[in-house]
Amino acid sequence: MRTFVHGGGRLPEGIDAALAHYRHQVFVGRLGWQLPMADGTFERDQYDRDDTVYVVARDEGGTICGCARLLPTTRPYLLKDVFASLLMHGMPPPESPEVWELSRFAARSGAPCPRSGRADWAVRPMLASVVQCAAQRGARRLIGATFVSMVRLFRRIGVRAHRAGPVRCIGGRPVVACWIDIDASTCAALGIPSASAAPGPVLQ
């Protein structure tokens, strides 16, 4: 698995369609999400815009095998606009250059899995690139809506992940707003020596 960062809402020719197709496969096809702007092949929404930062993973053959979307909370973002009910009662959605939203996160390994078959085999390197990318843009925390099972997985990896509100059932699965602290503990767990100084993933 190799990760690539694409900033400013810019995706190279061919990657835009491939990423939208991969997101449709994962979030609509596999997870069964009812997304209003998804058609029969592609998944995009109003948060794919000029300030969106994408982290895209590709396997040895160049096929997309992971994705993530980062948005600054100083502009409209998914959790604030759609899932604010997931936040703790009375907690305003964050609006800070030091907090970025993580959404559309998915990963599968581009290499054979170890015998253990552990899910973090693919998630850990993908999340490492996401955290590194966000930190290089001034983020100290990430926030986003995710499955409770994903929060447990982040914690098992060693990431400082914790709930930002109550668990709610959405689409038949428990979902929660989740903080990820970009601190020394998280960086060490992800193999990032320093969140601000570590070499970043390939930029395009």
From Swiss-Prot:
Gene name, Swiss-Prot/TrEMBL: solI
Catalyzed reactions: a fatty acyl-[ACP] + S-adenosyl-L-methionine = an N-acyl-L-homoserine lactone + S-methyl-5'-thioadenosine + holo-[ACP] + H(+)
SUPFAM superfamilies per UniProt: Acyl-CoA N-acyltransferases (Nat) (SSF55729)
PROSITE patterns, A to Z: AUTOINDUCER_SYNTH_1, AUTOINDUCER_SYNTH_2
Broad class of enzyme this protein falls into: transferase
Function field: Required for the synthesis of acyl-HSL autoinducers that bind to SolR.
One Pfam entry name: Autoind_synth
EC number: 2.3.1.184
Family, as annotated: Belongs to the autoinducer synthase family.
GO molecular function terms attached to this record: N-acyl homoserine lactone synthase activity
Name of the featured protein: Acyl-homoserine-lactone synthase
Lineage summary: Bacteria, Pseudomonadati, Pseudomonadota, Betaproteobacteria, Burkholderiales
Entry's Gene Ontology BP terms: quorum sensing; signal transduction
The organism of origin for this protein: Ralstonia solanacearum
Keywords attached to this entry: Autoinducer synthesis, Quorum sensing, S-adenosyl-L-methionine, Transferase
